């Protein structure tokens, strides 16, 4: 029994363990309670000698009569009291309800944290948590911070389910439905950049995605226009002069048919003379009638006419004068080949995508393009030819210039005629 009492007395009333026995200090008053030196709030030599436990420090000073009455108690009862007092309540055990500590509700904890004053503490019985409503129909509610005291209890709050009304989605307009999603995303991104919005993490991926979309759109457009790009070899080379005023402009050009062109147009393009004397005619509403109120594209072009590669000062001035005269007068060039009108227009009248594709291939912004009027309906749109009957009907035959050979002897003859023309001119 003595060994049991001794083991009970050698327990620290702060941590509840025996620990290092040499570091245990006994209370100087009751000689029962013990505490480790490293568990004391203030550890010093004087504290270890005059150590007073918590019970003795709170106990009032006893007079002589009280001490004498204690001595009158039987020894067995005094030993039992001493053993019970040597077992303090550890901190990890639940504090009894008769203690001075009281539980407070989470609402009071929140008010204390915010600095508000609380009136009488109120206690609420935890309510059972109801079944969780479906996702998307409730608003998330911010919970209270968890109390860090050892005796705090978690109070479950019932979340109020708030049913949101269905959001009304407006239908897209027909014009918006025709726009590609990638183009709309790119336009919205460009607007955000224009407003000065800063890029965040992940914008690099979005920028990469927009570039991929633009590249795919351009590739699709290229695939559609590849059959109508200029052929690899030129079919005509010569000079273009104004028949009314030959001295106004005089430039050297070369013509390339489209990769796929009507057979009659291909035959007529080979019959163009070396010296092409054209007549400037106002365009008016001709393009609107020919192309049904839309801008012409590469699929409508039958012959491309590019300036020669000469970069002399005289040739550059003549070339620029031709394009400037057509722009100022809003005119086109007209020439009859075996009774069939050939109309030549400026590159600025094509749609933007066609201009960009030709610029990527030929590295030039200014070029000419021509079409042949092979039908009676197209002849009726041109002033002065409404009663004219087409000499060469369109039989539907299409020439593929990427696979069919060209007549190179014709090109050699064109070179000789040009040399003879230059000699006569000089």
UniProtKB/Swiss-Prot annotation:
Knocked-out gene: effects: No obvious developmental defects. Plants missing all PHD finger-containing proteins (e.g. PHD1, PAIPP2/PHD2, AIPP2/PHD3, PHD4, PHD5 and PHD6) exhibit an increased expression of flowering genes leading to an early flowering phenotype under long-day conditions as well as growth retardation.
Protein residues bound to Zn(2+) 1: 12, 15, 36, 39
GO biological process: negative regulation of transcription elongation by RNA polymerase II
Residue numbers spanned by region Disordered: 122-144, 185-205
Zinc finger boundaries on the chain: PHD-type: 9-59
UniProt binding sites for Zn(2+) 2: 27, 30, 53, 56
InterPro entries xref list: AIPP2-like_SPOC, PHD1-3/5-6
GO MF term list: histone reader activity; zinc ion binding
Top-rank lineage group of the source organism: Eukaryota
Transmembrane segments: none
Keyword vocabulary terms for this entry: Metal-binding, Transcription, Transcription regulation, Zinc, Zinc-finger
The keyword Protease appears for this protein: no
UniProt keyword Calcium present: no
Oligomeric form and interacting partners: Interacts directly with AIPP3/BDT1.
UniProt function note: Together with AIPP3/BDT1, cooperates to form a BAH-PHD bivalent histone reader complex able to read histone H3 lysine 27 trimethylation (H3K27me3) histone marks in order to regulate transcription, especially to prevent early flowering; promotes AIPP3/BDT1 binding to H3K27me3.
Name the record gives this protein: PHD finger-containing protein 6
